[in-house]
Design a protein with these regions (language model features):
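Short beta-strand-initiation
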Residues: 28-30, 68, 77
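Short linear proline/tyrosine/threonine-rich motifs used for host-factor recruitment
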Residues: 21, 33-35, 47, 57, ...
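Short glycine-rich, low-complexity segments
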Residues: 1-39, 88-91, 95-97
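Residue-level signal for the start and early helices of compact helical domains
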Residues: 9, 73-78
Length: 97
């Protein structure tokens, strides 16, 4: 994973809040997760799965973890794994704009 790409994503999500997450229903036990940039562009980047037994404190609590395969985003009831190549594509698109 390119360190600059990761730092950009981390800054966008954790510090500047220029990227927000939106959930869209797709099936009974899964929803699409969208990344929305500050310019209003939405990118479908993963499918998240319902996890009823979560130990996150609140619904709004988001946890971001970097793994070899990609970025893992967890909320109280959902978890999504986003491949690094899709994050790099999102970063490249954002830079073009």
């Amino acid at each position: 994973m390119n360190k600059i790409v990761f730092e950009y994503l981390f800054e966008a999500v954790e510090i500047n809040s220029v990227v927000s997450l939106e959930y869209r229903h797709t099936t009974d036990n899964a929803q699409a997760i969208l990344v929305k940039t500050k310019h209003g562009d939405s990118y479908k980047i993963a499918v998240i799965r319902y996890k009823p037994d979560s130990d996150c404190a609140t619904t709004n609590n988001k946890v971001f973890e970097a793994h070899d395969a990609g970025l893992v985003i967890s909320t109280k009831h959902y978890a999504a794994a986003i491949p690094w190549d899709e994050i790099a594509a999102l970063y490249t698109e954002a830079v073009k704009n």
